[in-house]
Amino acid sequence: MTKATYSPSENVYEADEAYWQGEEFRKETPCFPKSVYKYLPDLLNECILEEEGDREQDLSFLSNLTALSSVLPATFGIYNHKKYSPHFYSFGIAPAGSNKSIAQTGRYLLEEVHDWILSNSELQQKTYNHKYTQWKLDCTYKKKAHEECPEEPEKPAYKMLFLPATTSYSRMQIQMRDNGPQGSIIFDTEAQTLATANHLDCGNFDDMLRKAFEHENIDSAFKINGLAPIYIRFPMLAMFLTGTPSQMASLIETSEKGLPSRIMLYTFRSIPKWKPMGDDSISVSYTHLTLPTNR
């Protein structure tokens, strides 16, 4: 809970006390056991930032796990008589100055995969444009000869792995539909970005996030989508966010809607430390930390 503006009312005092209780709780939250890191597969083991502190390692590890869950679309399991993919939601919560940006390692893992998917989509669009132009020419000649036009080529879906956090309800639905069994991920180190979009009139996609987590069908028929309604069967979505406690409160205003129970929360509070510019650490940008792609 966030600190409220000063007021003599009892509610403000209660909110203030709850805020500091939360901050004290964050100081005592445990780190992942060392045994977790001891038996990691090589792919994950190579992603561990050994020179960082325990909190940074944990946050980076959670980021990597969430990212990898989004690129295993052919992997499934059964839980409570339901079929689930590995996709899951996680949220790293800590005050400002806690080095939460280290969680970008998960995004770096997927950048090359995302670029590969975009390149394929752009190539398919160019191929379609060529076929469509040729189809129009053929139709012109066929009409002059009083012959039937050939079937119009089908426009391919434009796929991408990352769903932008700045989006609308309809745009998110369309992209999840276009991605199909490939799946998607929302990855943003500023939870406020998604919270702001969710509060817009064109947003309000809490229900879609809840359904996607459970792989429940998502249907809609808005005017903006044209005559054909949108049907998404077995949606697959992963989500990783980091932010401050107030950003979490802005995104998850109440537990009654059910979204909090679907998110893995990792919260902590640590003493901010200055990192000198002349340290010996190496860059962990996507040029050094990427998944292999089958081209």
Predicted regions and their residues:
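Phosphate-handling catalytic cores of nucleic-acid transaction enzymes
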Residues: 2-289, 295
